Amino acid sequence: MLESIDTSMVDWSRAQFALTAMYHWLFVPLTLGLAVIMGLMETLYYVSGNEFWKRTAKFWMKLFGINFAVGVATGLILEFQFGTNWSNYSWFVGDIFGAPLAIEGIVAFFMEATFIAVMFFGWNKVSKKFHLASTWLTGLGATFSAWWILVANSWMQYPVGMAFNPETVRNEMVSFASVAFSPVAVMKFMHTVLSSWILGAVFVIGVSAWYLLRKREKEFAVASIKIAAGVGLFAALVTAFSGDKSAYQVAKYQPMKLAAMEALYDGGTHEPLTVVGSLKIPEMLSYLATHDAAGYVPGINDLLLGGYTLPDGSKALSVNEKIEKGKVAIKALSDFRQAKEEKNEEGMQRARQMLDENMPYFGYGYIKDPNSIVPNVWLSFWSFRVMVGLGMYFILFFIVILFLSWKHQLSKASWLHWVALWSIPLAYIASQAGWVVAEVGRQPWAIQDLLPVNAAISRLETGSVQTTFFIFLIMFTVLLIAEIGIMLKAIKKGPEEVQ
């Protein structure tokens, strides 16, 4: 049923999915971040009755709506690719992967679609309390949608809660709770959503700083910056905390990804964390990976050759040994299906036992070159440092803003206004870099240790994938330019007077 395909179609299919995902992710974090900030602003309006906060909230809602609409359009195309370009993947794990996506579409999206209408068109038509609830429920719906998408992605990083059925050649869900609330999913949700709050906060601060540079809307801009900086600092600190927990999980479930992130070829105990070049933090990598400064961290060569001692006391297998076990599993699956056709119960039981024993290595049976399980080290290494470095910068950025706000110097610090304005693209770079680390570091696996990308794709002509790649590239670029143009027009117009 699953056959390894080693052609340029794999690379083009990966490139197309990466293009779609990265364009889509230009819009999602701003939606999540603005939802919280505009919700807080409308809450202040509800509590105080001050029309200033209504005017402020409505302005950011307008930008939220523009961004939300384009994000939905790009997201729909992204989900369709699982059926068009990755049909083997959809067949092999569709029963599991499809569940969170179905919940996201049926529950979360309709929740957003319902309450966003009230949020935009319900002013002066519904009560203040109901409108406030609609605003928060719109944001909650977007966050709930992100939860299920991240559950699906986390399952690809750490597949749990399923059992392989050799009769259908599919993985079937046996524990919904294990899939929905796996430790990887919880940490990924926290890290991703809170980092989106950072991006939303930086966006609000940057746009508000533009007004201060133009000496327009001073009260509106200062108030927006204060709220956004508070949200941003909280989010940045929690994101850093969740990043620490995520490092421990990566070391446990995806050690090759961690080794690539650190460009660590030969592991050991008391491993330092490389900042850049020869600048290292002593024993920090061992502590992050094992919660023990003296802990052993395997490097790329260790993971390829095996032989080191695992935490449970057993010896790690080499990749070649895993490949052999994977081939045994694939052969056992073939034997099982043949025995079933022949109605050979004894043969089925024997093949099933062999399959179960080697199933943890099933995906390795499609790996031809042991070195191919090493992801792009250069890209993983530098993407991780860009993400972490900018994360630390944003913590300092928010602290400086809150300090100047406390000193009542916020509107006078023109240097900071320029810094804030140019920090907007930095927030997007940090967000994209995080996904590069997560996805490039997982390669060559579509599902960690279970299904490599070369066995997950559809049988398509390379030319057709290339054609749709460039169609999507042009279409998404046009959408992005249109969104930026509409946003700039709304920003130049500024907040409207409350009617």
Regions found by a protein language model. Name each.
Residues M1-Q499:
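Polytopic transmembrane helical bundles with strong interfacial aromatic enrichment
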